[in-house]
């Protein structure tokens, strides 16, 4: 081989041929030998031999790169199959871990399968990890995967990231619009959800049944009857096919907006009635304290052969509570397991405790709690605590409050209920101690808010809130009214600073 190289260097026209031969051999040893021999001959000063060496090195490098790419391609194909297999067998955690440890990009279809699995299992954190892996390995998102991620972020409540993905879409069809509307409504930002709905309509996107399910829920929460009727009219005009979810949301919307006749008429016109739509009707009457209507509808539901579910029974028990119907409450409570095989849960026990408490049967309520399998359920003790506060039973109040705080020590509302219970019984010092204990524990109560609708716009207010654009004028008016009441020596009930929170 050395002889071949040396003789070849004397013929510059054959240098390129030698390069190809060496490339075919793919041996770094001969490449270095070629350079050494060339430097010792007359060709060492020739630019041609230098170029030949450069070409040779480049060709060898390309060969290595090609081999690396082929190897990587094989790894990726194997990884794709493995990840899909893990998803099919429900091993999502292993799939995400393997994806990260590989440090490789996979096919868009594989990413889509992983994200879909995260969505179905409500493993939103794992979905975000997959998105982070895409970013780390430099994967360029296509429009389909952007929509997949948008839906995942919207479901998880991360509307900021969902909004960024939404705005980055080149084409916004109905699916991303629905995801954004639903995301805002589920997070309790119904007003913003309606804004997006109207923005979608201005962009000439035709809504579907999923759109209206979210819009009707938003109108229910905001008590926006006119907006709900307008959406219902669009649904009828566009001949949008309904489903059980939309039907129940529509019935619920009319009842929540105090339009009983419209709500019942929609229910009567339904082609299919099931436990969900029946429960919406019963719940609608219960929401407004129509106890007799709740019980009538419940009986009619059973007559038509529709079996109630735990939610239906909870609505009925709550109605019995509001109506002070203790015996009826017991009847339906025992009927759950006896007639329908439904095991009462914590909320059902809490409803019965509340019913007994309203009737002043506190000792019976306490004994019922102690015998129940849900005595470790905080709302059960919360119901007893509320009843003790109303009837001024300090002994049971302290017992219920102690257990309540023990089960849920981080809930600021529990401390407030306890303190208010002491205050209602005239024990101001004890109430102050509870508030100090709450402060020392670093526990805060989530602020409540009030809202009103003026000229089609909903305005929300919280304590010490200055975020409203007319805050200065609002507070000025409040001070004027306060001064006026003081001038005429009028003090509303509960204005004393030591009153319950």
Curated annotation (Swiss-Prot):
Keywords: Repeat
Example GO biological process: RNA modification
Family matches, as InterPro entries: E_motif, Pentatricopeptide_rpt, PPR_At4g14850-like_plant, TPR-like_helical_dom_sf
Presence of the UniProt keyword Signal in the record: no
Keyword check for Repeat: yes
PPR repeats: 107-141, 142-172, 173-207, 208-242, 243-273, 274-308, 309-344, 345-379
One of the Pfam families matching this protein, by short name: E_motif
Type E motif: region residues: 380-455
One MF term in the entry's GO annotations: RNA binding
Region (Type E(+) motif): 456-486
Family: Belongs to the PPR family. PCMP-E subfamily.
PANTHER family hit by this protein: PENTATRICOPEPTIDE REPEAT-CONTAINING PROTEIN
Protein name: Pentatricopeptide repeat-containing protein At4g16470
Record organism: Arabidopsis thaliana (Mouse-ear cress)
